[in-house]
Amino acid sequence: MVLPTVAIVGRPNVGKSTLFNRIAGERISIVEDIEGVTRDRIYATGEWLNRQFSLIDTGGIDDVDAPFMEQIKHQAQIAMEEADVIVFVVSGKEGVTDADEYVSKILYRTNTPVILAVNKVDNPEMRNDIYDFYSLGLGDPYPVSSVHGIGTGDVLDAIVENLPVEEAEENDDIIRFSLIGRPNVGKSSLINAILGEDRVIASPVAGTTRDAIDTHFTDADGQEFTMIDTAGMRKSGKIYENTEKYSVMRAMRAIDRSGVVLMVINAEEGIREYDKRIAGFAHEAGKGMIIVVNKWDTIDKDNHTVAKWEADIRDQFQFLTYAPIIFVSALTKQRLNKLPDLIKRISESQNKRIPSAVLNDVIMDAIAINPTPTDKGKRLKIFYATQVSVKPPTFVVFVNEEELMHFSYLRFLENQIRAAFTFEGTPIHLIARKRK
C-alpha cells in the first residue's frame, strides 16, 4: 500500500529541515553502515496517531544555481504535483515576506490541503505576531517552535486530519514490481518491450498526476503481475524531471509499493552514484532485487565482458550479493523472456517460510562448523531461532547476551541459512534477542 505524501515547502532559513527532522524523528537515521546504503534527507517516513505518511522536504530538491524565486516556485509546484497534504513553513521572527506571499498565491490555486506552520515562535510573547499570516489567505496559522518541539503536535494533528482515507490492502496474490533507474537508462523501452507496444497504451489508471501508473498483465501460467511506474518517470516535461533528487523521490514512491524492484543500469554509461543510492533504498526497504543491465546490444563484447561486468557490479553493490544480474536489450528483446520467471522466483523467496525445526538444525550445524564467539571469557550461547515474518524473511535468534552476537557471526549464520534454503533475490534479516 502506497503511503500518503506530505510535502514541506517554504523559503530558505524558515526551519523546514528542522521541522522535517522533528516530524521524522529517529526514522531518518541510516540503517546500515555500508557504502551505497544511504538515507537521503529529503525523504522520510512520519507517523502520528497510528497513521504513517511519506514526508518530503522539497527544499532538498532545489537547484542551488537557480534564481531564488525560481527555487521556491519549483518547490511549490513539486508539492502540488506530489503531495496529499502541504505544510507551508514561514518564519514568525521575520513576519510575512514577499517570498511568502509569492508562494501562497501559487498554493492558493491547489485543491491539496495546505497547513500554514509559523515556525520560530520560540516564546509565548511571539504568538500574538502570528495573526499577520492570516493575510496569506491559507487559513489558521499554527505557531511552532521546531527547535523546542512546541506546536509540532498540533501540526501533526492537522496533517493526519487531512490525509486521504486509508486504502484497502492490496491482493497478495498479485506480484508487484517496479523498474527504477536514472533517466535515459531505457526504463520506458523496457516496459514497452515487456508488455508489447499495444498494451502499454492502456496502462494509466485514472487519478491525479502524482498517482503511480499501474500496468496489469498475466503470464502464460496465469500469474498476475502489476508493474508500477511513477507518473514522473513516464511523462516528459514535468518540472525537475531530470534532476537526480526529484528522480530519487519518484523512485522511492515506486519502491514503496513494490515487492520486487528491477534496478536498471545503462550498459553504455556504467554504474553511477545515483544507481547505488536508489539500490540502497530498495535494499533497506527489504525488497526483492534484480540488477538489469540494459542496452547490452550497444557495447563491444569479448569472452570476458560478462565476467568483468559482474565483478564490477558486485564490487559497487556490495550490499546486493543476493541480487541476480541479467543483461538485456529492450531493442532486440534479448533475455527479456526470462524476467517474468525470475520475478516470480524472487517473489516466492520473499514469501518463503522455514519450519522452526528445520531452521534450528541448520543453526546447530553452523555452530558445529564455526563455534560461537567469546568476549572476555564469556561465550555466546544460541538457544534457538525462529522465523517471525516474510517480505523480507526475518529470523530472530535467541541468545544469552545480545552484545556477544558480533555482526560477522550474524552474517555467517545468514550465509549458512542462504546455503541451506533458496532465498533468491531477497535480503534476509537476522536479529539477535536475549532469551527471557
UniProtKB/Swiss-Prot annotation:
PANTHER family given for it?
A: GTPASE DER
Keyword vocabulary terms for this entry = GTP-binding, Nucleotide-binding, Repeat, Ribosome biogenesis
Binding sites annotated in the UniProt record for GTP 2: 181-188, 229-233, 294-297
Which residues are in the EngA-type G domain?
Answer: 4-167, 175-351
Is Lyase one of the keywords UniProt gives this record?
no
* InterPro entries hit by this protein: G_ENGA, GTP-bd, GTPase_Der, KH_dom-like, KH_dom-like_a/b, P-loop_NTPase, Small_GTP-bd
Is rRNA-binding given among the entry's keywords? no
Assembly, in brief, is: Associates with the 50S ribosomal subunit.
GO BP annotation list: ribosome biogenesis
- Record's function text: GTPase that plays an essential role in the late steps of ribosome biogenesis.
Its ancestry begins with: Bacteria, Bacillati, Bacillota, Bacilli, Lactobacillales
List residues of the KH-like domain.
352-436
Molecular function GO labels: GTP binding; ribosome binding
Q: Which HAMAP family match?
A: GTPase_Der
- Similarity-based family: Belongs to the TRAFAC class TrmE-Era-EngA-EngB-Septin-like GTPase superfamily. EngA (Der) GTPase family.
* Annotated positions binding GTP 1: 10-17, 57-61, 119-122
Q: Which gene encodes it?
A: der
Kindly provide the name given to this protein in its UniProt entry.
GTPase Der
